[in-house]
């Protein structure tokens, strides 16, 4: 099996490690974490090899595959920066799709996308690069999920919903059909979205309404 290195050593990385082991496609050689104090730690038996400076030497040593094991909620633009840096170094950023996920055969999936257990993604849907569809989420037919966006556990998207780049649909939120959510927006947990959400807007409630502050 080809070796793969993970970026991040927290809870998100744990889930990706488990998915990759279940699928049996890669040899998990280690993790990279920006906190130098994590050197030598283990996450589900996978060692932390060092900080970001190790990536270039790993690539030179023949490691060509990486997975993203971080997904910031507070600073979603950081997710884009991490992805672009890893790709610029030359790594193939692998997808992680849990074997229990129900993904229609024609769903388009970008690079570095993670699809967790118990999810349903229906026909005609497109997932961009570095997307997270978290545990138990439902993405119905003909949705478009932009790069670096996250669909949180238990969120439900009806048909033909568009989620822009870097946006987050929170835990248990519901989005009705044909809604458009702009770039770098945030839908709070449990919200019911019945109107379009502009870019860089936070909404919450039932029905969802704009919150007073905007994400950074």
Predicted regions located by residue number:
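Short helix-capping segments at alpha-helix termini
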Residues: 23-25, 87-91, 195
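Structural signal for interior beta-strand "rungs" in well-ordered beta-sheet cores
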Residues: 95-211
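Phosphate-bearing ligand-interacting subdomains
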Residues: 37-98, 102
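Conserved acidic residues
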Residues: 29, 64, 165
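Hydrophobic, well-ordered beta-alpha structural blocks that scaffold small-molecule cofactor pockets
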Residues: 1-43, 56-59
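Alpha-helical elements of the RecA-like P-loop NTPase motor core of helicases
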Residues: 14, 18, 77, 195, ...
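Short glycine-rich anion-binding loops that position phosphate/pyrophosphate groups of nucleotides
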Residues: 12, 71-74, 209
């Amino acid at each position: 099996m080809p070796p793969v290195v993970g970026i991040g050593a927290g809870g998100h990385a744990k889930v990706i490690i488990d998915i990759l082991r279940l699928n049996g496609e890669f040899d998990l050689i280690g993790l990279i974490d920006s906190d130098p104090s994590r050197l030598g730690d283990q996450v589900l038996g996978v060692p932390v090899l060092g900080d970001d400076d190790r990536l270039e030497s790993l690539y030179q040593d023949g490691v060509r595959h990486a997975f993203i094991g971080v997904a910031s909620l507070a600073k979603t633009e950081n997710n884009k920066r991490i992805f672009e840096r890893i790709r610029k170094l030359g790594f193939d950023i692998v997808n992680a799709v849990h074997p229990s996920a129900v993904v229609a055969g024609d769903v388009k999936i970008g690079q570095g996308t993670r699809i967790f257990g118990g999810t349903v993604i229906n026909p005609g849907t497109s997932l961009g690069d570095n997307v997270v569809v978290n545990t138990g989420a439902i993405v119905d037919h003909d949705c478009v999920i932009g790069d670096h966006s996250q669909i949180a556990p238990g969120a439900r998207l009806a048909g033909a919903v568009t989620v822009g780049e870097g946006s987050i649909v929170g835990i248990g939120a519901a989005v009705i059909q044909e809604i458009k959510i702009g770039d770098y927006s945030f839908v709070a947990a449990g919200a019911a979205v019945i109107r379009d959400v502009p870019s860089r807007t936070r909404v919450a409630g039932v029905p969802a309404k704009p919150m007073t502050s905007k994400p950074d």
